[in-house]
């Protein structure tokens, strides 16, 4: 925390001096917590839910009212809607099944089995019989059965479960029995039920829409078909409704998603719940994709099907698959990968990978950490001096109760060389999924590598880490280790860099896996010719 009164007093005496000197009060983050190793984290919506919301707003702008249709549909409704075609349609429906409730009695044999477990049944026989009878009649839910048995016999729930497993094996042998109820395979089956209830209650004409999940028993799922999908469906009911309303709604709805020209082509399927010659496929042109796409189907419900539901006015229905529209909008090729990305390979961006390249060793003590910057500045300033040569950086620290004098010597003994090698200022970039070391200038770089490195520098993402930065942190970290181990001197020599570890860098496992799986590279090779001797007294 700032000492505010002292700062104000200093500023009153000499504002310029106070302004400069208080700079040191703003501490910089440590290297592994600084940008770009920290990055903003954003929430992410699902493309299907985005499309659903966009469709909702599009329908509402067109004056439609939102409804939720029944999801569970009796097979009788399918027969009413499809007539003779129903049997073929039901083949694609999922039927709901449930486990029967066995008639479990409390015979002398079962009482004996319970008592063999060390439980006295005689006092609780009537309560136990009542629970078993209640389960059979459906007044007791299955997930409460173990709890109620345990209460009745005044035992733990663990023992109650043991009784259910060992004394009443009938429960383990149950086989699900199908009902006559189906999961909605298309929104139309729900619309007929809704329209039947609204007939005579809601003034005509009315416009309704519903966006919800449907279930279809496909033979197999592939890149364009799932067993569960979302339908964005609407109906218009009124005395003057006909096929032209479908065309107008299709244009009004789809134009809000970037489609322009429209073609209306008679559908060859001819579903029996539509009036003959009204079932129509909608093809729309998308300027960005530059192609015609089938995006919706509409038709006017058959008077035969409507009459069976007590509806005596024409009804136009239009429907489209939400996932289909999402794939078009997001340029996805496989509906499975779009809907369930968690089951497919995830790709990290160059920016994400750049945040995962970190320093391996960094000093813990602030005083030694701060020494690193001095060492970096000294090396960069003198990197090109002619050898034989050496640089010295000397500093005194208090470690515990002991005074430590540290002398860092960077040297090159060989004649007519430079203090440090040509790659010492190379910077780590991430480009097209690769991690590469890019030189400060491209002078002397082979032509076969030059174009790639130039593109990497312009289009890639920098980590902000130079070889000299990471190596200097390695040196000061070893100084700190020497303090702890009471070592008086050590040497460090890094002639040629071949890997990230050579320059005191590491990469998170998730990024490394992607680089390897996608046949990308980590190429940080380069001569640095760093020679260091450290003496501690």
Curated annotation (Swiss-Prot):
Keyword presence, Aminoacyl-tRNA synthetase: yes
EC number(s) per entry: 6.1.1.27
Pfam families: SepRS_C, tRNA-synt_2d
Catalytic activity, reaction form: tRNA(Cys) + O-phospho-L-serine + ATP = O-phospho-L-seryl-tRNA(Cys) + AMP + diphosphate
Enzyme's top EC category: ligase
InterPro entries: aa-tRNA-synth_II (IPR006195), aa-tRNA-synth_II/BPL/LPL (IPR045864), O-Pseryl-tRNA(Cys)_ligase (IPR005246), Phenylalanyl-tRNA_Synthase (IPR002319), SepRS_C (IPR041590)
Keyword Lipoprotein: no
Highest taxon above the source species: Archaea
GO molecular function annotations of the record: ATP binding; phosphoserine-tRNA(Cys) ligase activity; tRNA binding
One of the GO BP terms on file: translation
PROSITE patterns xrefs: AA_TRNA_LIGASE_II
Keyword tags: Aminoacyl-tRNA synthetase, ATP-binding, Ligase, Nucleotide-binding, Protein biosynthesis
Binding site for substrate: 186-188, 231-233, 273-274, 317
Primary role: Catalyzes the attachment of O-phosphoserine (Sep) to tRNA(Cys).
Subunit structure: Homotetramer. Interacts with SepCysS.
Protein family according to the UniProt entry: Belongs to the class-II aminoacyl-tRNA synthetase family. O-phosphoseryl-tRNA(Cys) synthetase subfamily.
Protein's recorded name: O-phosphoserine--tRNA(Cys) ligase
Organism: Methanococcus vannielii (strain ATCC 35089 / DSM 1224 / JCM 13029 / OCM 148 / SB)
Phylogenetic classification of the source organism: Archaea, Methanobacteriati, Methanobacteriota, Methanomada group, Methanococci
């Amino acid at each position: 925390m700032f000492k505010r009164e002292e700062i104000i007093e200093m500023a009153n005496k000499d504002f310029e001096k106070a302004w400069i000197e208080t700079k040191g009060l703003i501490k910089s983050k440590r290297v592994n917590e600084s940008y770009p190793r920290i990055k903003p984290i954003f929430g992410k919506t699902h493309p299907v839910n985005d499309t659903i919301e966009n469709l909702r707003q599009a329908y509402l702008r067109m004056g439609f009212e939102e409804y939720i249709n029944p999801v569970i549909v009796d097979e009788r409704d399918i027969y009413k809607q499809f007539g003779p075609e129903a049997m073929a349609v039901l083949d694609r429906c999922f039927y709901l099944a449930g486990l029967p409730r066995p008639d479990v009695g409390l015979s002398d044999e079962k009482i004996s089995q319970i008592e063999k477990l060390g439980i006295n049944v005689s006092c609780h026989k009537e309560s136990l019989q009542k629970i078993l009878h209640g389960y059979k009649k459906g007044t007791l839910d299955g997930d409460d059965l173990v709890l109620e048995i345990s209460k009745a016999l005044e035992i733990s729930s663990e023992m109650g479960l043991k009784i259910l497993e060992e004394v009443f094996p009938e429960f383990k042998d149950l086989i699900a029995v199908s009902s006559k109820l189906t999961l909605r395979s298309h929104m139309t089956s729900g619309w007929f039920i809704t329209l039947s209830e609204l007939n005579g209650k809601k003034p005509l004409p009315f416009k309704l829409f519903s966006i919800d999940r449907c279930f279809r028993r496909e033979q197999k799922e592939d890149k364009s078909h799932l067993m569960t999908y979302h339908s964005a469906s609407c109906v218009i009911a009124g005395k003057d409704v006909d096929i032209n309303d479908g065309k107008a709604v299709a244009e009004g709805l789809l134009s809000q998603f970037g489609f322009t020209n429209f073609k209306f082509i008679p559908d060859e399927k001819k579903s029996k719940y539509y009036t003959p010659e009204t079932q129509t496929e909608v093809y729309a042109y998308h300027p960005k994709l530059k192609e015609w796409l089938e995006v919706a189907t509409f038709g006017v419900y058959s008077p035969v099907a409507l009459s069976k539901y007590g509806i005596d006015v024409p009804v136009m229905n239009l429907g489209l698959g939400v996932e289909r529209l999402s794939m078009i909008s997001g340029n996805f090729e496989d509906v499975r990968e779009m809907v369930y990305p968690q089951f497919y390979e995830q790709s990290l961006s160059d920016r994400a990978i750049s945040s995962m390249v970190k320093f391996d060793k960094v000093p813990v003590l602030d005083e030694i950490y701060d020494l690193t910057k001095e060492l970096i500045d000294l090396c960069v300033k003198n990197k090109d001096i002619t050898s034989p040569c050496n640089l010295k950086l000397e500093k005194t620290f208090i470690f515990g109760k002991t005074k430590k004098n540290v002398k860092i010597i960077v040297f090159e003994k060989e004649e007519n060389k430079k203090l440090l090698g040509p790659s010492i200022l190379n910077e780590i970039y991430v480009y097209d999924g690769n991690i590469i070391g890019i030189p400060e200038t491209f002078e002397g770089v082979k032509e076969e590598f030059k174009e790639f490195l130039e593109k990497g520098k312009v289009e890639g993402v920098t980590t902000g880490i130079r070889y000299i930065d990471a190596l200097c942190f390695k040196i000061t970290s070893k100084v700190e280790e020497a303090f702890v181990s009471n070592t008086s001197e050590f040497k460090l020599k890094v002639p040629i860099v071949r890997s990230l570890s050579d320059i005191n860098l590491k990469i998170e496992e998730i990024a490394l896996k992607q680089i390897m799986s996608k046949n990308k590279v980590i190429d940080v090779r380069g001569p640095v010719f760093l020679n260091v001797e450290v003496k501690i007294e």
